[in-house]
Amino acid sequence: MNPDFLDFEQPIAELEAKIEELRYVGDDAEVNIQEEISRLQAKCKSLTESIFSKLSAWQVAQLARHPRRPYTLDYIGRLFTDFEELHGDRAYADDAAIVGGMARFDGQPVVVIGHQKGRDTKEKIRRNFGMPRPEGYRKALRLMRLAERFRLPVFTFIDTPGAYPGVGAEERGQSEAIAMNLQVMAGLRTPVICTVIGEGGSGGALAIGVGDRVMMLQYSTYSVISPEGCASILWKSAERASDAAEALGITSARLKELGLIDTIIPEPLGGAHRNPEQMAGNLHTALAEALQTFSAMDTDALLERRYGRLMGYGEYKEG
């Protein structure tokens, strides 16, 4: 199976394999097979549109985890200039699962922070599979306070299965680190724009996800627990992850419907990994619009709006 394609994409993979085979034959043959290639390409596009028009929540979760999906550093390289990464929380250590630093966005100085997963085994281990420890969140907090001091807008990119639940992380105050970030971000006196680019896993995502605008890429997810974890608790079997994904309402469309996010950023046909440049362009447009909107606001008005947004989540009913 081609690793670029997920199980539900296999009909697409088979068509693309045929196209590649014809191209290979066409290079050596005297006959012109371009017409057949064009026909198959049109069929492939139509099939892809059909499959992606009716994705289940579980299939979206698989896309959000795709191994070739662009990560934070991929977007930083495409959207920002003069990026200078800063390291360490000035208390314990540097956590490579969180990256961040100073950069320029369309020439404007900003602070950018995000989760970072790994591509190969070595990098996955170094990045702890994108699961931050307390020092990662404290590093993010240090950068946000730095941004506030110099009145720099903050961009955060969310892509994590969740905060690391190891014994050492708990001993060093994982829950306190997350809670402190929530508190500080709610009152940060500078624009904060958050984007879920892959997995938005529970408190590990929320710890850099409180802002003036929360956006999601079309095939990203945001939930309190992974579908497998939920299924294991409710039905004692991770095999019912697809049922859990539907029940959790993890997709961007469902979360927008519930009012938990503000904007859905469209992805290229087939997902962000199929055309990272186009995805970066779509993301740039959304970030630029948000930055223009919130940079023009008075600080007190910005904070009042942010507080109102947070207090608008959910509803209270007396029994």
UniProtKB/Swiss-Prot annotation:
Subcellular location: Cytoplasm
Protein's organism: Thioalkalivibrio sulfidiphilus (strain HL-EbGR7)
Primary location group: cytoplasm
Pfam families associated with the record: ACCA (PF03255)
Record's catalysed reaction(s): N(6)-carboxybiotinyl-L-lysyl-[protein] + acetyl-CoA = N(6)-biotinyl-L-lysyl-[protein] + malonyl-CoA
Role of this protein: Component of the acetyl coenzyme A carboxylase (ACC) complex. First, biotin carboxylase catalyzes the carboxylation of biotin on its carrier protein (BCCP) and then the CO(2) group is transferred by the carboxyltransferase to acetyl-CoA to form malonyl-CoA.
GO molecular function, a single term: carboxyl- or carbamoyltransferase activity
Record-given protein name: Acetyl-coenzyme A carboxylase carboxyl transferase subunit alpha
Lineage, broadest ranks: Bacteria, Pseudomonadati, Pseudomonadota, Gammaproteobacteria, Chromatiales
PROSITE patterns: COA_CT_CTER
HAMAP family for the chain: AcetylCoA_CT_alpha
Pathway, per record: Lipid metabolism; malonyl-CoA biosynthesis; malonyl-CoA from acetyl-CoA: step 1/1
